[in-house]
């Protein structure tokens, strides 16, 4: 990415902040590439100087982060064989790192990803992934899970209000939001990922080096 602003010392901090909120929030299958990179340059040709603490700096950082989030989500939507775009939002954690750990464990679970491909609101697989995320003293009875606004699990089991009709309706969209409330703190984290389809297996099985 490039800019004509005169930024100087703040350019690297802007980039790190925006990448943390965007490209570092995505995963398709848990693997990372050896040659992925994000670059940001500023030529200064506009003559507009971005100084620390200024309104220009705040607006620039917000715009840069918004742009990078859009680009990062486009990468997920274009994932190999992806048929669903999935946002996993974890709240109520003791720290952002703990919430991130839960979100990534769910996002990387083959059982969760294949259930999403099958449009199966399988709360058991999601809860199992949460349970193996490695959080100490996690009370699964305190965890609740919503899928596209539908409560599917609470108190360690299927929600009493849940019906198959509600689950089917929630899974109808190509964009899915999984909300996981840990109810043990005030921190949160979000990860964007995909389902795991037949085409993902085919594409990667047919690709030979």
For each of these PLM feature ranges, what is it?
Residues 1-7:
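Short, small-residue-biased leader/transition segments that mark boundaries at the very start
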Residues 11-71:
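Acidic, glycine-rich loop-and-beta core segments that form the ion-binding/anion-interacting portion
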Residues 12-16, 39, 84-89, 141-147:
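Beta-strand segments within the central parallel beta-sheet cores of soluble alpha/beta enzyme folds
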Residues 19-28, 70-76, 128-131, 161-166, ...:
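Glycine-rich, charged/polar anion/phosphate-binding loops
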Residues 100-101, 108, 112-209:
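Internal helix-turn-beta structural module
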Residues 44-118:
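A glycine- and small/hydrophobic-rich beta-loop-beta segment
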